[in-house]
Structures are given as structure tokens and as C-alpha cells.
């Protein structure tokens, strides 16, 4: 049976029979909220109660991959589909996911463990029997885009399961969002942001020409509310004598109506490019829609020969979850233009394979393992040699301290895709270390608890807070819990085998890109700082269902 959010908030407190607040008084029970004006979508539950897009009746409800899975680059290889998503400063990164039906996805593993910088939107390609992932990297030290110091790297392998080559600098600087294509001339190209293109070598590993402007984008009406014109995320599809160029425009964040999917086509890879007469084929038209800033699409043919768009969007009211992966069917018109037919994605849609019974997702309670590093826990902005900090034993994860606190400790974070969830972890402090449990956006914005043997620290908006106090220290062996109830985060603490005690609560809806930049998401995270180690044992994740 799934626990409700109300149950979870009171779980640690009910162990003691009462809730002790700062004054020692018992806390009042949570009151029942008034009914919402409209019912929320109902997802099927999967591992640990995580929401699952496959409804089990031949239909699906977006997102197909919940949580921060932005800028999907999708590739069909026989009966398999593979996807990569922007991984930013998280390493091991460039995690590959696999599907047979475009709805259910499971992780394969990371293709990149060497820290290069902030990894942005990638593309996957297969050429002459070999696999390639093209990786744009922002090399600015703070991961933000001032000056756009980008480089494009490539890794390659004989199999999508790896092993992957070390990253190779292609000599293409100042551009992002590579989209691989092969022209009618048999030559290989990367299409880039802002309508640019560059020819690459026959082996796909280096630049073989100059970057040139080939497409001006679709002219967005002046009265539309967008973030910026920003042509980006180019993907090339060759079909029926045409090359189709799918692009994102309008800006990936900002107002809800910003992002969109536009299409152009040409008889030649060299242009000229003709814009689709019914652009944009996908766009959030108003702030009442369930998915905001929809864009950055990859077109892909489904198992039955039909056509689909895989793209990202923000969930209305839950920007903290990041840009999630959405799936929408599209048709071809009589004059060979794509036309999306999913509407605003408010309800279920027929699955590409109605009777498929594929597995989906990742058990987050099982990520304290070496073989889950990258697909589960990832280091944020790690230093060289970062993998040596983590030792995995039958007892759990032993993490060496780094820095003085969460901001410079390179926390280990993981993606959570549920509107409400709880995370619990048992830990032991070894030596002169300190560490704990966070909700982590980046090294400047986080909240949570950190413990030393003689002190308990609370963090809010990226810094330690002294009021209200999180309470007294609880020793070297303790447990921490966070309940994130639709962007209201409550942290609990207990000494070994003692009752739970509520420490602090925060409202965290503002921990998102539109407030803090960076394009990332709010993630549960573990950290260890100081001179010593933290032993993390028995991490448990559980999605929480609405009361009722």
C-alpha cells in the first residue's frame, strides 16, 4: 500500500507519539486541504511508488521519463531506441537509456566519466557500424553561459553498451546542440545552434570545414511571449526525398509560452530551407496547460512505422523537477509536412506498442552500489580523481570528505521525478568529517541538514542558518529524512534507534532555473566534508501519493 504525503510527514513524529517543536509543544495535525479546482492526472505507480507513464491499458500519460531528463537525443537501432539527456555538471554523465516502445525506459550506463565541464544537449549517431555521441561542453568554471566558451567533444564505441572512447575535442568551439546528419553527397555534418552547420571528417571525430550559417530560423511573431528567438537543438530527418530540420526556438525556460518546435525542409543538405507553413508544430499556448516550454524535439519512427516526437517540458507548478521527457505522436500531411496531434498532453494517449510489457525506471533505494554510479548517484562538479572518493562495501557507501560544507563538497545527487517523495538514509560520521542529506540545486542554492558529532547544522538557500535551530546534535550514528511534499520540504533527524524529530521545514518552489539560472533541477543529495569519511547505509526512496 502506498503511504500518503500526510503519513510521511508524520512518520518520524508518530514514532514518539507527539511532535516536539522549538517550544516543546506538540504539533497540530495536518489539516485537510480544500479540493483542487480540477483533478490531477493519474499515473500508474511503478518501482517504490514512482509515477509511471505506461498506464497498463494500451495508453500512456506524459511524462514518459519523469524528472530532469532534458534535451532528449534519441536514436533507433534495430528494435531498440537509445536516448541521452543533458547531464550538466553531474558525473559520471551522458547516461544512456534504452527502450523498445518509446514509453518504458531503463538505464544502460554512463558514457562519460572524465569531468570536462557542463555537458549540454547531445546527439547519438551510428555510421559504418560504429556508434557516436556528440557532446557540447560549457567550460566556464561556474557552468553558466557568459561568453559561451563551448567546445564539442565526441565519444565512440562498437556497441551502445560501451566501452566508450575517451572524449575527443573536435575543434568546434563556441557552439552547442550538435545534430548529426549525412548528406546526399555522403559527407557527414553537424548542425549546430543558431542555424549553423559544419562538415566533419569521414571518421566522425574532427572538424573538416568551417562553421557556416545555413538557416535563419522561423520568424516568431512579435507579440508572442518568449524568452529569446534562440534557434537550437537541430535534428535532421531524411524522408521521401526531403531533409527535414527540426529545431527548438523561443528559449528553453523563461515564460511558459517560450519554447516551441519548428520545422524546415530542403531537397539538399545544403539548402535552401523552406519553413513549414503551420509552424510551430508544438508550443505551449498558455499558462493553464499542464506542460510549459515544450520543445527541443527529436523525430523518430515508432515500432509500427508511425511517427513520434520526443521532447522536453516543465511540469506546471513543478519547475523544481527540471525539464521532463514527453512523447507526442505526429502525422504527415498530404504535402509531406509533419503535424503533431497530441494537443496539450493533458490526458492519456495510445502507446506506440499497445500490448508492450517492458520494464521501466530505476529503483532509487538500490543506488548505494558501484554499478549504480552514474545511472543513480552522480557527483556534482567533481574534481579530478573524484571516483576515488567513493568506496562501495556490503555495508553501503563510504564517502571521503571534501571541502568545508555542501557548497564545495561535490555532493552525490540523484534525479527524483515525483511531485512528492521521501528519502531516508542512515549514516555514520568517521573522524573529523561532517555530512548529511540535502535538496540540492547547485553549489549556491540548496537546503537540508548536515551533522557533526557535536553539532547539527541546517542549510537554507545555499548557506547555513542559525534560526530556527535544527536542534541538538545526535552523535556519530544517526538517520536523516526529507519529505518533499510538492515543494514543501521537511527534514527529520534521529539518533540511532531513537524516535524521529522534526528539524526544519522550507518552501522550495523557487529552487529552479528561472530564479537561479543553470537549467538544472532540485535533487536529493548526500554530502561529506571535512577530514574523515561518511558511511551511508540503507538509503530508501519512496514516492508519496496524495491524501485520500
Question: What spans do the regions from the language model cover?
Answer:
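Carbohydrate-active catalytic/glycan-binding domains of CAZyme proteins
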Residues: 1-2, 10-13, 28-548
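N-terminal export signals
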Residues: 7-27
Amino acid at each position: 500500500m502506498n503511504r500518503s504525503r500526510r503519513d510521511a510527514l508524520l512518520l518520524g513524529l508518530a514514532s514518539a507519539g507527539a511532535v516536539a517543536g522549538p517550544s516543546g509543544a506538540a504539533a497540530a495535525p495536518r489539516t485537510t486541504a480544500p479540493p483542487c479546482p480540477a483533478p490531477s492526472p493519474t499515473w500508474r505507480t511503478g518501482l517504490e511508488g514512482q509515477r509511471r507513464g505506461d498506464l497498463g491499458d494500451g495508453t500512456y500519460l506524459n511524462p514518459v521519463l519523469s524528472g530532469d531528463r532534458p534535451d532528449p537525443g534519441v536514436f533507433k537501432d534495430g528494435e531498440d531506441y537509445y536516448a541521452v539527456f543533458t547531464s550538466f555538471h553531474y558525473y559520471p554523465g551522458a547516461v544512456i537509456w534504452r527502450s523498445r516502445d518509446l514509453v518504458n525506459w531503463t538505464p544502460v550506463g554512463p558514457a562519460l566519466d572524465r569531468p570536462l565541464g557542463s555537458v549540454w544537449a547531445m546527439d547519438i549517431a551510428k555510421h559504418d557500424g560504429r556508434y557516436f555521441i556528440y557532446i557540447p561542453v560549457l567550460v566556464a568554471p561556474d557552468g553558466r553561459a557568459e561568453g559561451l566558451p563551448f567546445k564539442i567533444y565526441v565519444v565512440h564505441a562498437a556497441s551502445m553498451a560501451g566501452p566508450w572512447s575517451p572524449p575527443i575535442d573536435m575543434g568546434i568551439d563556441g557552439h552547442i546542440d550538435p545534430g548529426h546528419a549525412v548528406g546526399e553527397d555522403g559527407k557527414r555534418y553537424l548542425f549546430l545552434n543558431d542555424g549553423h552547420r559544419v562538415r566533419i571528417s569521414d571518421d566522425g571525430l574532427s572538424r573538416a570545414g568551417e562553421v557556416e550559417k545555413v538557416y535563419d530560423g522561423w520568424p516568431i511573431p512579435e507579440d508572442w511571449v518568449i524568452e529569446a528567438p534562440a534557434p537550437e537543438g537541430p535534428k535532421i530527418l531524411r524522408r521521401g526525398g526531403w531533409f527535414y530540420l527540426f529545431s527548438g526556438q523561443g528559449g528553453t525556460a523563461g515564460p511558459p509560452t517560450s519554447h516551441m518546435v519548428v520545422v524546415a525542409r530542403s531537397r539538399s543538405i545544403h539548402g535552401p530551407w523552406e519553413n513549414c507553413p503551420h509552424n510551430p508544430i508544438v508550443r505551449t499556448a498558455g499558462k493553464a496547460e499542464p506542460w510549459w516550454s515544450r520543445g527541443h524535439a527529436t523525430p523518430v519512427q515508432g515500432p509500427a512505422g508511425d511517427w513520434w516526437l520526443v521532447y522536453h517540458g516543465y511540469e506546471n507548478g513543478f519547475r523544481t523537477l527540471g525539464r521532463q521527457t514527453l512523447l507526442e505522436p505526429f502525422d504527415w500531411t498530404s504535402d509531406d509536412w509533419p503535424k503533431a496531434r497530441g494537443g496539450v498532453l493533458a490526458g492519456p494517449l495510445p502507446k506506440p506498442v499497445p500490448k508492450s510489457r517492458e520494464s521501466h525506471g530505476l529503483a532509487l533505494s538500490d543506488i548505494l552500489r558501484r554499478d549504480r554510479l552514474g545511472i543513480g548517484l552522480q557527483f556534482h562538479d567533481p574534481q579530478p580523481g573524484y571516483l576515488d572518493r567513493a568506496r562501495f562495501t556490503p555495508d553501503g557507501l563510504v564517502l571521503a570528505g571534501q571541502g568545508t560544507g555542501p557548497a564545495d563538497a561535490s555532493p552525490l545527487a540523484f534525479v527524483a521525478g515525483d511531485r512528492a517523495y521521501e528519502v531516508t538514509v542512515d549514516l555514520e560520521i568517521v573522524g573529523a568529517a561532517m555530512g548529511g542529506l540535502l535538496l540540492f540545486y547547485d553549489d549556491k542554492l540548496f537546503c537540508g541538514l548536515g551533522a557533526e558529532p557535536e553539532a547539527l547544522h541546517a542549510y537554507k538557500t545555499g548557506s547555513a542558518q542559525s534560526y530556527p535551530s535544527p536542534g541538538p546534535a545526535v552523535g556519530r550514528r544517526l538517520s536523516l529524512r526529507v519529505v518533499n511534499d510538492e515543494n514543501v520540504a521537511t527534514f527529520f533527524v534521529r539518533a540511532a534507534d531513537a524516535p524521529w524529530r522534526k528539524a526544519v521545514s522550507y518552501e522550495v518552489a523557487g529552487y529552479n532555473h528561472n530564479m537561479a539560472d543553470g537549467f538544472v533541477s532540485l535533487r536529493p543529495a548526500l554530502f561529506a566534508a571535512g577530514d574523515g569519511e561518511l558511511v551511508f547505509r540503507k538509503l530508501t526512496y519512496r514516492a508519496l501519493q496524495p491524501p485520500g
